[in-house]
From Swiss-Prot:
Disulfide bonds: none annotated. SUPFAM superfamilies: BRCT domain, DNA ligase/mRNA capping enzyme, catalytic domain, Nucleic acid-binding proteins, RuvA domain 2-like. Its cofactor is Mg(2+); Mn(2+). It comes from Thermosipho africanus (strain TCF52B). The keyword DNA damage applies. Residues 587-665 form the BRCT domain. DNA ligase that catalyzes the formation of phosphodiester linkages between 5'-phosphoryl and 3'-hydroxyl groups in double-stranded DNA using NAD as a coenzyme and as the energy source for the reaction. It is essential for DNA replication and repair of damaged DNA. NAD(+) binds at D34, E35, E36, Y37, D38, S83, L84, E114, R137, E171, K287, K311. It catalyses: NAD(+) + (deoxyribonucleotide)n-3'-hydroxyl + 5'-phospho-(deoxyribonucleotide)m = (deoxyribonucleotide)n+m + AMP + beta-nicotinamide D-nucleotide. The active site is at K116 (n6-amp-lysine intermediate). Zn(2+) binds at C405, C408, C424, C429. Keywords: DNA damage, DNA repair, DNA replication, Ligase, Magnesium, Manganese, Metal-binding, NAD, Zinc. Its EC number is 6.5.1.2. This is DNA ligase.
Length: 665
């Protein structure tokens, strides 16, 4: 194949991946599995490395990996990014409507209501359909060039579906689930957690290392076209449809309202629904729909006259701190938790709120007995936002940093000067072991069924194990000491433990509990190093040269394997007969090669994860959605909607016994 054909193949792959990015991140309607997508991306990465002359700054591969920047240069906006006037009540919205109609000299005005996403505003510029720059709002006159970081946001296209030269604007945000995930890791690792998703977004988008941005899974909604008349657009509603057509993600909740009463009804509706969303919103943005009307109304120096923010009432309530509990996590981080007088906050009873760390307590001057305002960060996570100091009586107690671990009584301290967390420094702390064991035996790791949270706690409390590797040395006599376990349960647990010795390498890596190493990273490491021994000997440079492994992850891997306790755990796993190497691809059968499966329901002989691994090991593919390209729907007990879809499309349906016959014959 000559270079011209390779160039054509690269272009074709880019277009295909961009299409799947759009289906997944914009439409939320993927048509291929994650595995298929990863294969396409991997192939493109390999071809671009082999033929660097075909490099493109807008290739989908620019969304993985990262660059380290010196800083962010300031750039003037093409037109100012203005702020909005705002209101919190219905009467002022009605006054806004009357003012608009009076200025325009009309009796009726249509409005577009958009969710006011609490994130970071961004201006995106494209030339001939190619991404050029991304600017933050800054002071509204000039912003910072955040292009390298914005390239890592999967919902923002690097190439449009049309070859347009255009500037659009929107909001970058961190979904609540990503915010929760980051803060959980931050607290475990002794890092300062973010107060809310908006701060998390701002802190992420200004990272000098764009590989960190890629890992934090920011998202976007685009809502504004600069100079819309160039593209024949006459209304904001048309502009939103146009933005989606050319490849941008727009918010599905936007609503066209024919009068102000519709606006108020929608505001009331979203006031109730806002806590059900996976992103933080603090109100609606009400815009005059007609662009000609917008031009007539104009702007003040601060804000457009044709738009207003209709804010939601604050989700907060008053409570009192009754006590402080100290929780110990997997890495020993001690997290203070406020025990509160129960309060009803947005329909749920709140009795506790995390205080994150002792620096946070000092900064907010929080004391036992204080009356405080409690708010739901992102509409979900209870947190104390302020102390009502005027209600202090003088009987409040200052919260002291513990001098010893609340669980084991061991020494506490910081493992580095930079971190804010206080940790239990005892390597044998039972609470640390309990939290690690929960990960170790989980489905995503060694998948040892029968060892639920309560049984794990009893095993640790009975001192039957000193570390996670000891699970492979348990005997029937050991387990007989655990209340609630009969002979049948003991036999089942021991059978599952024996079976777990052949766990795939990537799941072994997950089970080790290396900070910041999840399933995707574990698979990358397993494919690259093939064994725990090779991974444990990897250098920082070797790790950071791997696509998808950033500096933070590399540092954690090296620190983890340098630890003497880790070395002991690895030795014990090896001596117990746990497989610490990856099977070579040559062992793969091609029995199911070229066949695509979808799985639904529950199985007697396998877990769904095991079924997936069997199919892939035999050369088949597993996807999440039934389509005309699906060869088989494998059905267990209580199948879901996929069963009906397969019937409609005429996809062959097989049960567990038929599947067993297929893989054995």
């Amino acid at each position: 194949m000559d270079k011209k054909k390779f160039k054509e193949e690269i272009e074709k792959l880019r277009e295909e991946i961009e299409y799947h990015n759009y289906r997944y991140y914009v439409l939320a309607d993927p048509v291929i599995s994650d595995e298929e997508y990863d294969k396409l991306l991997k192939k493109l990465i390999e071809l671009e490395k082999k033929y660097p002359e075909f490099y493109s700054p807008t290739s989908p591969t620019q969304k993985v990996g990262g660059k380290v920047l010196d800083g962010f240069k300031k750039v003037m906006h093409s037109i100012p990014m203005l702020s909005l006037d705002n209101t919190y009540n219905e009467e002022e919205i009605k006054e806004f409507d009357e003012r608009i109609k009076k200025l325009l000299g009309v009796n009726e005005v249509e409005y577009v209501c958009e969710l006011k996403i609490d994130g970071i505003s961004v201006a995106l510029r494209y030339e001939n359909g190619q991404f050029v720059t991304a600017l933050s709002r800054g002071d509204g006159i000039e912003g910072e060039d955040i292009s390298e970081n914005v390239k890592k946001i999967k919902s923002i296209p690097l190439r449009l579906f049309k070859n347009l030269t255009i500037e659009v604007r929107g909001e970058i945000f961190m979904p609540v689930k990503e915010f929760e995930k980051y803060n959980k890791i931050a607290e475990e690792e002794g890092l300062q957690p973010f107060a809310n998703p908006r701060n998390a977004t701002a802190g992420t988008i200004r990272q000098l290392d764009s590989s960190i941005v890629a890992k934090r899974n920011l998202d976007s909604f685009i809502y504004y076209v600069v100079n819309p008349e160039i593209y024949g657009l006459k209304t904001q509603w048309e502009a939103l449809k146009f933005l989606k057509e050319i490849g941008f993600k727009t918010n599905p909740y936007s609503r066209l309202c024919h009068d102000v009463n519709c606006v108020i009804d929608f505001w009331k509706e979203m006031t109730k629904k806002r806590t059900q969303l996976d992103y933080w919103i603090d109100g609606l943005v009400i815009k005059v729909n007609n662009f000609e009307y917008q031009r007539k109304l104009g702007e003040t120096a601060k804000a457009p006259r044709w738009a207003i923010a209709f804010k939601f009432p604050s989700i907060k309530a008053e409570s009192k701190i009754l006590n402080i509990e100290l929780n110990v996590g997997r890495t020993g981080v001690i997290t203070p938790v406020a025990v509160l007088e129960p309060i009803n906050l947005e329909g749920s009873i709140v009795k506790r709120a995390s205080l994150h760390n002792f620096d946070y307590i000092k900064e907010k001057d929080i004391r036992i007995g204080d009356h405080v305002y409690v708010e739901k960060a992102g509409g979900i996570i209870p947190q104390i936002v302020s102390v009502i100091k005027e209600k202090r009586t003088g009987k409040e107690l200052e919260i002291e940093i513990p001098k010893s671990c609340p669980i084991c009584g061991g020494k506490v301290g910081k493992i580095s000067e930079e971190e804010v967390a206080i940790r239990c420094l005892n390597p044998h702390c039972p609470q640390k072991l309990k939290r690690h064991m929960e990960i170790f035996v989980s489905k995503s790791a060694f998948n040892i069924s029968g060892l639920g949270e309560k049984i794990v706690e009893k095993i640790v409390d009975a001192r039957l194990i000193n570390d996670v590797a000891d699970i492979f040395y348990l005997t029937p006599f050991d387990l007989a000491q655990i209340s609630g376990l009969g002979q049948k349960s003991i036999a089942n647990i021991l059978e599952q433990i024996e079976k777990a010795k052949n766990t795939p390498l990537y799941r072994v890596i997950i089970g080790l509990g290396i900070p910041l190493v999840g399933e995707k990273t574990a698979k990358i490491l397993a494919d690259k190093f093939k064994s725990i021994k090779a991974l444990s000997q990897a250098s920082y440079d070797e790790l950071t040269s791997i696509e998808g492994i950033g500096p933070e992850v590399a540092k954690n891997i090296i620190e983890y394997f340098k630890n003497e306790k880790t070395k002991e755990i690895i030795r014990k796993l090896e001596n117990a007969g746990v497989k610490l190497e990856q099977e070579e691809d040559t062992k793969k059968s091609s029995k199911l090669a070229g066949l695509t499966f979808v799985i639904t329901g529950k199985f007697n002989s396998f877990t769904r994860e095991e079924v997936k691994e069997i199919i892939e090991k035999l050369g088949g593919k597993v996807t999440n959605t039934v389509s005309s390209k699906t060869d088989y729907l494998l059905v267990g007990e209580k199948p879901g909607s996929k069963y009906q879809k397969a019937l409609e499309l005429g996809v062959k349906i097989i049960n567990e016994d038929e599947f067993k016959k297929m893989i054995i014959d």
